[in-house]
Amino acid sequence: MLCLGALTSPAHAATAVTYFVSPSGSDSNPGTSADAPFRTLTKAQTAVRSIDKSTSGPITVMLAGGVYRLSKTLTFSSADSGGGTAGTVWWKAAAGQTPVVSGGVQVTGWSRTSADSSIWSAPAPSGLDTRQLYVNGVRAQRATGSLPVSVTQTATGYTTASGDPMAGWRNRSAIEFVYRGGLGLWTEPRCPVASVTGTAITMAQPCWNNSTRRVMRTDDSGRTYNLVGRKSITEAPTAVENAYELLDKPGEFYLDKTEHRFYYIPRSGQDLTTADVEAPSLDTLVATSGKASDEPSHIGFQGIQFSYANYTTSNTGTGFSEIQATYQVTGSTGYATQGLCTFVSGGTCPYGNWTKMPGALRFTYDSSIHFDHDYFVHLGAAGLDLGNGSQNDTVTACVFTDISGNGLDLGGVDIPQPGSAAQHTSGITVKDSHFYDTATEYHGGVAVDAGYIETSTIAHNQIDHVPYTAISIGWGGWPDKVRLPAQPNYSNNNTISYNLIHDHMSLLGDGGAVYTNGITGTSMSNGEKVVGNVVHDQLNTSGGHVLYTDNGATYVSILGNAVWNINVSPWGSKHVNYTAGDGTYDPTDIEGNYWPNGPSDYDNKKVLIKDNHAITGSAQVPSSIIAAGGIESQYRAILSWQPA
């Protein structure tokens, strides 16, 4: 029988319902007890949909530990919603257990390629394409090395002065060139090779054009500026990836898609005859219907690990022509038109609408979706995406790590001025969560990225050991480079407060702990608030600031933060407010911060800087500020969490 519990008064009792699921269960079971669980999440979803939520009591789907392998995306719609007497429908881990929702396939049958070789191989599922491999939960590195020959750039790629050794490599069209800093200090674009013939290297399209032919803009004084980043990659690649001939270090792998085999050199202590080797196969683990008319609401996920999602667009001719924060230029005319709106003839609108890297979990047009003590790990693109139309969602005490791109995406950049309130991303709370080792592959990614959002809070999180910016918020401010107004948008009343951020900016430049771009409100009262954050050990020396107000950042208040042990300025910088058009700066309020080498007091042209404190280290910061930064005490156990 169903797991029942009486609620409210006996005359109007609402029955609590619990369904049980286990990887060792059966979908022919009733699923109403831990002794007779369902086997699949889709069967549990069907059962939940059959309940009348208007009269039901609380509904729980209880997941036993183990791996739930998905062959297709688990999609939620209005039929899955809670509400009414049912409240929130919770999908949750059984006590003391960690269920893993996986988009991966196991790779078995490993053997040495020869008796004296360090390389092992195993068959890959036919048709599988992936950029990742995980051995006992440890991410392997695609075979990588340096470019083996000097090159000269051409319109279609490169030429070499003498014969190119890559011409003799197998599967040359699978080779990928990596350009750290190639389209700006904050970027790391990647383009595949199309062919290598003699001394000619032809690069794949449209990635090559999108990375070498970007439109420049001339302002009214005749000065030519880039809109975002550089016009073109001009240097030779800083690394070459994905060739069997580069497979030479423990922990590296290569997937030969022609012969359908993986090759791998084990790390010390790894035994491939017994190891759990996982290859991502499914791009999206969980998603919503994406329709405002079919909005899921009042659904929660608790104690679940989401892992082994795939992403292979970068393997195609599209490559990865990065703009910023893993947004990229795509399409055959992307370099000339995408997101450029009124800036160029034929430019597509709105301004700044570049292509977003998808999340392993993708939510749009939803409300009151809750993530509590969930774990986002071993993912091939972004982690969790709460996009357009996500409203009143919460992320509490979650862990984001070993993610190829951004950890958490909020909002988007494609609808700056929505036609309806349903399109707003609003009321999001991200708190007491741990982000570390994100952007492990696409190093220009950020731990938490927010585009256009409103009335949202990012508070009491810890972000550490990331290659670029920790938190990025806002978009569309770059037109001020050519003396034009920033993109109007609906962002307002967002707060970034009491976060602990350290050991960030380890690989790229021109970023910060908290980076803001574009208009954040309509006044100082409802503009962005950056309050009480504790930041130390920002690692870069090339450009950027710690609390960074970049192009068009308007109505930002930076109050009571603490910063130490840095190699760049703690705040920057003033920008002319071309939206106002009156010669003032973008309105900014900077007060009561503790930091080294901060700006002098200033009160002019709508920028106020006062009562800040020059320090040389943490000992000069009030203990109350340090104590308030980061994860609150009741949630700190997540700092010792380990993947299942």
Which residue stretches match the model-derived regions?
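Extracellular beta-strand solenoid repeats
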Residues: M62, R69, T75, W90-K92, ...
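Active-site-proximal loop/turn and secondary-structure-junction residues that shape catalytic pockets
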Residues: S390, D414, E454, W475-G477, ...
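Short glycine/acidic-rich loop motifs that flank beta-strands on beta-rich extracellular proteins
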Residues: K72-T73, D283, N310-T316, P358, ...
